[in-house]
Amino acid sequence: MKNNFVSAHRNAPLTAKILSAAKLNKRMRRMEIYYDEWESPIGPLLVLACEKGIIRIDYGRMKDLKDEISAWLLKNGAEPIFIKDSNQTNQAKKELEQYFKGELRKFAMQLHLFGTPFQKKVWQALLDDIPHGQTKSYQDIAYTIGNPKAVRAVGGAVNRNPVAIVVPCHRVIGKNGKLIGYNGGLDKKEFLLKHEGFLN
């Protein structure tokens, strides 16, 4: 089975890239998952990767999130073997540090995301169509993906985004302009939008 390589912002050199996870075999497979964690201006960040790219960025620490992440991987057909290895996550850490310093507006790290085709379509739209310093509503995203009636489903996909900050679900706001629905908490959403210059 070939992996579909989708480059976000195809004409821009410094943008995140999604490497879609292949369809999973019925038989569970073991997968080495590399991780690292560090303190950021927004609190502790946990980055996880497989050999093909970054699979998750979470707010928090491995000791608190390991069970949740293990269950998520098992649901996606992978039995995780967790290995603390900063070499595998170093590029992501560097880019995130540059982002928080205001030196990076588009991420280049390679992503390997687990999700349904619809979810990946929504996540790709977030990467392609909401640049740094801008926001869109859930309805806007539904129109972008060619399914204007799927606002609720878009909300569900945004809520399940596994890669915080890089896949910018924090840039999706309510139709009325209010900050709603962010897994990291509205305080983090507000912090990120202020950092990007959308909010004062």
Tell where the protein language model's regions lie, with residue ranges.
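Basic nucleic-acid-binding alpha-helical/helix-turn surface characteristic of O6-alkylguanine DNA
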Residues: 2-148, 196-200
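A generic hydrophobic-helix recognition signal that picks specific residues
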Residues: 36, 161-163
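LysM (lysin motif) carbohydrate-binding repeats in extracellular/periplasmic proteins that recognize
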Residues: 148-151, 192
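Regulatory, non-catalytic segments
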Residues: 152-161
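Major-groove DNA-recognition helix of helix-turn-helix-type DNA-binding domains
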Residues: 166
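Long, intrinsically disordered, low-complexity Ser/Thr/Pro-rich regulatory/activation regions
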Residues: 171-196
